Regions:
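ATP-dependent carboxylate-amine ligase
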Residues: 1-139
């Protein structure tokens, strides 16, 4: 966890971008939910290597995200199943890839927010971390 500069102040960034499984996503969401924050934002990339169960596993995480997040951004074809299972007010945006998601997420973050970035390595969520921290890291 580290603080990043955003327009008008700072936000908390939780970088869990290296790997993702159903259990680790749920654990990450619990960490996000425990943070004192104005809003809790979840940036989620596909969990890869789930086989035929991939769509259902992604959709099942919507219940957790709905309870623990205020806003959800997704990228990749599998995360679309989670995204569309959420109530419309929680949908920040769905994008084809992390490169497309990064600027929209950056623009959405406000002072006092806590942001969890999570996805399988192949989802390239590290691109988002770089976009959020480039020359902006506070601590």
């Amino acid at each position: 966890m580290r603080r990043i500069r955003v327009a008008g102040g700072e936000a908390l960034l939780i970088d869990d971008s290296y790997n993702a499984s159903v259990a680790s996503v749920r654990a990450g969401l619990a960490v996000l939910a425990a943070q004192p924050a104005t809003r809790r934002i979840f940036a989620f990339g596909d969990m890869l290597e789930l086989g035929a169960e991939g769509p259902a596993q992604h959709a099942a995480l919507a219940q957790d995200a709905e309870k623990m997040c205020d806003l959800v951004f997704c990228c990749g074809p599998l995360s679309n199943h989670l995204f569309h299972a959420l109530p419309a007010p929680q949908r920040g945006g769905h994008f084809p890839d992390s490169t497309s998601l990064a600027p929209a997420l950056r623009a959405a973050i406000k002072p006092g927010d806590a942001v969890l970035v999570k996805g399988s390595l192949g989802s390239r969520m590290g691109v988002i971390i770089k976009a959020l921290t480039a020359g902006e890291q506070v601590s």
